[in-house]
């Protein structure tokens, strides 16, 4: 153990010496070697003489080069190869070496240095080709031109290629191309990456302008104000509400000297101090105002919970029914009202830098923290398309290290909302929503507490205005909990006299807990076949309600109930004159009908999984849903349909067209999101009640659904069952008479009643004397199954005979007489 400790201590000491002291001096030593070699080469080239002994010349005279025979040989090789460009080798080595010695940065990128050296060598070759273009002067002592062997070879090769392409002035064009390449390469090698034309123009203009006469220096200011004092002075006295001041500077910042008079500033403008790019970026963000929305105050309570505890007021109706108490629901934990403004600003800066990396320019103008997500409002620069930012949702989530990110346009503002989950997620409880003043004092007829907005505000929707709701979401997204919260919202508001339910639950798990409550018109339907019968009964109930409303001349259920209550309060009734027939003289007979209307309750049909029903009886379900969605609003009948498979075979075009209000919980793909909402975004949700609510008109709002446990639902259902026995209607699931059901089936297919269709088929068979299923199918333009049913009925009633071995039937009925 001691040996291992000594070894680790030795290694740590060696690393400290190596990286803390030795490595900077090693970098300086290498730079010094490069500098010395460059100086030696420069001296050898400066004292070059073509007559000195070298590899190309053998003489008995001593070398006149300052470095002797070695210097003469090296300088001869460089001059013969590159000509005057050989001077560039020595100069580049001096630049590299001096820079290395001056900086001595151990973290310097060696790869960058190697790249600069390689590009510099290529630049010297291009420069030699440029120098080979003009003819050498008379004092030039070498056989090759001013560019040496490599310069002449490169220039003649490129000129030959251009001449082969019949381009005039090939040599001049080649020299120009090599000149451009040499300038770019050598500039990169010495560290010139960008050239600012405006800076060059300003420098030339300042050089050409006459200098202003120096004025006497002003007296020094009494005292210089530090940076913090100047910032405080620059800020307005009363900052805008909801905006945080810029971050304060450090205590030990260097004071800034007092400002000079205007004349002195015109005479000389000092250059700005050089500072790190990251610090400059952060300072610019600090100085920019960034509004942070204040967290919402706790939801304003309606006082219902206090009244229930004091027993000073009970929610009794005329029939003695008592609404459930809020104490049956779980109480929420207190939320923190403080917002970490520094963390939000830091996230906003990081988000801006991430967007800049993907080429999106803009500015975070507003930050809206919420219980589950925080929305950063990006004001994009002119020319930035919204679709481009929306497409970066996955990349933004990856760069910000969050689970998911949703990007959408902020309604009514020139901003793009970027929604990212909070590090700590708050839970929304149904009790908080039902105890809020928005729910208690709302004017909605069928209020549903959908959840809280991004800012933490309760969101109460009215099912009567929707008028139907389509819900989709995968398993575990919070869909079933959301449906339970919607049902409980109505049960906490309306007694059975005002609202009744028909619940269809093919999965036999989600809605069975409500079985036996007084609000139900029938037991919870779990058989898909009985679900079809229940929907057909709902259609008949809708038509019956329309007949009642037409008798007293009202347009909707609200007007009908109002008149019914007024008539009952006054002890009056309605009278209507109807024609009952004709007398012997042919005159119509009228009678007075007395109508005593009774208030009709609203009817809510809840289907938990419509996909199972579509698999069993897709056409019947779609036809019934279509009729109810188109006509049931005025009759006070509303649908809530939910599915965990939002595919096009379940949510058909007919269903989507009649359900303008939809809710999408988390789905698995963008295709499912487009199927339910018409646009993507639902695949970026967080699950556990996180939803997108699309109201009529296509406006989409992100909501966080409330949590309600199975125990809470069971407690409320048990309380309601204790209030009384439900009054079930057997015909809801047993169905009406056969003729009515067949008529409804014919109405769903758009062909009128079943009897009319059968009479038409008999007329076709007796007139044309042809009896086959395919023939009836073609003539009546109906499906094969319906045509086969009509043929079996005609065989049963003796219109046609049984089919023989060839499938032909004998027509037993007499032919139809001609008209």
Swiss-Prot record:
Membrane protein topology class: Multi-pass membrane protein
Regions annotated as coiled coil: none
Side of membrane Cytoplasmic, spans: 193-819
Annotated Basic and acidic residues bias: 298-309
Keywords for this protein: ATP-binding, Cell cycle, Cell division, Cell inner membrane, Cell membrane, Chromosome partition, DNA-binding, Membrane, Nucleotide-binding, Transmembrane, Transmembrane helix
Feature: compositional bias, Low complexity: 236-247, 257-267
PROSITE patterns: FTSK
Locations listed in the record: Cell inner membrane
UniProt GO BP: cell division; chromosome segregation
Main location, first listed in the record: membrane
InterPro entries per the UniProt record, alphabetical: FtsK/SpoIIIE/SftA (IPR050206), FtsK_4TM (IPR025199), FtsK_alpha (IPR041027), FtsK_dom (IPR002543), Ftsk_gamma (IPR018541), P-loop_NTPase (IPR027417), WH-like_DNA-bd_sf (IPR036388), WH_DNA-bd_sf (IPR036390)
Record field: compositional bias (Acidic residues): 275-284
Domain of life: Bacteria
Entry binding sites for ATP: 476-481
Segments crossing the lipid bilayer: 31-51, 77-97, 119-139, 145-165, 172-192
GO molecular function: ATP binding; DNA binding
SUPFAM superfamilies associated with the record: P-loop containing nucleoside triphosphate hydrolases, Winged helix' DNA-binding domain
Subunit structure as annotated in this protein's UniProt entry: Homohexamer. Forms a ring that surrounds DNA.
Recorded family membership: Belongs to the FtsK/SpoIIIE/SftA family.
PANTHER family documented for this protein: DNA TRANSLOCASE FTSK, SPORULATION PROTEIN RELATED
Task performed by this protein: Essential cell division protein that coordinates cell division and chromosome segregation. The N-terminus is involved in assembly of the cell-division machinery. The C-terminus functions as a DNA motor that moves dsDNA in an ATP-dependent manner towards the dif recombination site, which is located within the replication terminus region. Translocation stops specifically at Xer-dif sites, where FtsK interacts with the Xer recombinase, allowing activation of chromosome unlinking by recombination. FtsK orienting polar sequences (KOPS) guide the direction of DNA translocation.
The record's note on its domains: Consists of an N-terminal domain, which is sufficient for the localization to the septal ring and is required for cell division, followed by a linker domain, and a C-terminal domain, which forms the translocation motor involved in chromosome segregation. The C-terminal domain can be further subdivided into alpha, beta and gamma subdomains. The alpha and beta subdomains multimerise to produce a hexameric ring, contain the nucleotide binding motif and form the DNA pump.
UniProt name for this protein: DNA translocase FtsK
Organism: Caulobacter vibrioides (strain ATCC 19089 / CIP 103742 / CB 15) (Caulobacter crescentus)
């Amino acid at each position: 153990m001691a040996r291992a400790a000594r070894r680790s201590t030795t290694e740590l000491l060696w690393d400290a010496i190596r990286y803390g002291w030795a490595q900077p001096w090693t970098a300086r030593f290498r730079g010094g070697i490069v500098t010395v070699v460059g100086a030696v080469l420069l001296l050898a080239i400066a004292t070059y003489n073509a007559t000195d002994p070298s590899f190309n010349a053998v003489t008995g005279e001593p070398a006149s080069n300052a470095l002797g025979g070695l210097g003469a040989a090296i300088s001869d090789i460089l001059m013969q190869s590159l000509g005057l460009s050989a001077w560039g080798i020595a100069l580049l080595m001096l630049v590299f070496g001096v820079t290395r010695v001056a900086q001595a940065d151990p973290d310097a990128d060696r790869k960058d240095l190697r790249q600069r050296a390689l590009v510099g060598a290529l630049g010297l070759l291009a420069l030699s080709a440029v120098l080979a273009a003009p003819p050498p002067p008379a004092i030039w002592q070498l056989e090759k031109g001013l560019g040496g062997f490599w310069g002449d070879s490169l220039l003649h090769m490129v000129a030959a290629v251009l001449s082969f392409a019949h381009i005039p002035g090939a040599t001049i064009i080649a020299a120009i191309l090599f000149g451009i390449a040499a300038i770019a390469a050598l500039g990169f090698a010495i560290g010139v990456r960008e050239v600012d034309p405006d800076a060059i123009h300003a420098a030339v203009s300042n050089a050409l302008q006459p200098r202003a006469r120096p004025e006497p220096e002003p007296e020094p200011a009494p005292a210089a104000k530090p940076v913090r004092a100047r910032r405080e002075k620059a800020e307005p006295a009363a900052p805008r509400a909801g905006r945080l001041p810029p971050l304060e500077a450090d205590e030990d910042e260097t004071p800034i000297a007092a400002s000079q008079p205007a004349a002195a500033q015109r005479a000389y403008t000092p250059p700005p101090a050089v500072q790190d790019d990251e610090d400059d970026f952060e300072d610019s963000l600090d100085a920019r105002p960034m509004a942070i929305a204040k967290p919402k105050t706790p939801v304003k309570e309606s006082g219902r919970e206090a009244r229930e505890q004091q027993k000073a007021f009970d929610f009794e109706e005329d029939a003695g029914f008592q609404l459930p108490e809020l104490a049956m629901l779980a109480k929420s934990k207190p939320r923190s009202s403080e917002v970490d403004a520094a963390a939000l600003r830091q996230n906003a800066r990081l988000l801006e830098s991430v967007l800049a990396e993907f080429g999106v320019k803009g500015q975070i103008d507003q930050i809206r923290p919420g219980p589950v997500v925080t929305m950063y409002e990006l004001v994009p620069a002119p020319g930035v398309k919204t679709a481009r930012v929306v497409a970066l949702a996955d990349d933004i989530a990856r760069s910000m290290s969050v689970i998911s990110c949703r990007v959408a346009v902020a309604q009514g503002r020139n901003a793009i909302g970027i929604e990212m989950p909070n590090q700590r997620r708050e839970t929304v409880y149904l009790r908080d929503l039902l105890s809020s003043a928005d729910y208690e004092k709302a004017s909605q007829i069928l209020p549903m507490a959908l959840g809280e907005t991004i800012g933490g505000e309760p969101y109460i929707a009215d099912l009567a205005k929707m008028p139907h709701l389509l819900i989709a979401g995968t398993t575990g997204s919070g869909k079933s909990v959301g449906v339970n919260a919607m049902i409980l919202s109505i049960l906490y508001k309306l007694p059975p006299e005002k609202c009744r339910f028909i619940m269809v639950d093919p999965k036999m798990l989600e809605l069975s807990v409500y079985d036996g409550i007084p609000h139900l018109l029938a037991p919870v339907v779990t058989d898909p076949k009985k679900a079809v019968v229940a929907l057909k009964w709902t259609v008949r109930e809708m038509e019956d309600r329309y007949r009642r409303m037409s008798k007293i001349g009202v347009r909707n259920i609200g007007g009908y109930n109002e008149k019914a209550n007024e008539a009952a309060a006054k002890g009056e009734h309605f009278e209507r004159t109807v024609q009952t027939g004709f007398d012997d003289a042919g005159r119509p007979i009228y009678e007075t009908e007395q109508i005593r209307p009774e208030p009709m309750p609203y009817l809510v049909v809840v289907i938990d999984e419509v996909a199972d029903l579509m698999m069993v009886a897709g056409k019947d379900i779609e036809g019934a849903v279509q009729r109810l969605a188109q006509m049931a609003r005025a009759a006070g009948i509303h649908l809530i349909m939910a599915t965990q498979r939002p595919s096009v075979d379940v949510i058909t075009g007919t269903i989507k067209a009649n359900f303008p209000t939809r809710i999408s919980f988390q789905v698995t793909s963008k295709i499912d999101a487009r199927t339910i909402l018409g646009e993507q975004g639902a695949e970026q949700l967080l699950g556990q009640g996180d939803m997108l609510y699309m109201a009529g008109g296509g406006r989409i709002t992100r909501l966080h659904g409330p949590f309600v446990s199975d125990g809470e639902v069971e407690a409320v259902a048990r309380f309601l069952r204790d209030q009384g026995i439900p009054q079930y209607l057997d015909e809801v699931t047993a169905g009406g008479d056969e003729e009515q059901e067949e008529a409804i089936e014919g109405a769903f297919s758009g062909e009128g009643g079943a009897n009319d269709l059968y009479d038409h088929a008999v007329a076709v068979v007796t007139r044309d004397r042809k009896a086959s299923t395919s023939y009836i199918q073609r003539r009546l333009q109906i499906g094969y199954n319906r045509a086969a049913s009509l043929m079996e009925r005609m065989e049963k009633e003796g219109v046609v005979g049984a089919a023989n071995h060839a499938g032909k039937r004998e027509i037993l009925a007499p032919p139809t007489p001609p008209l």
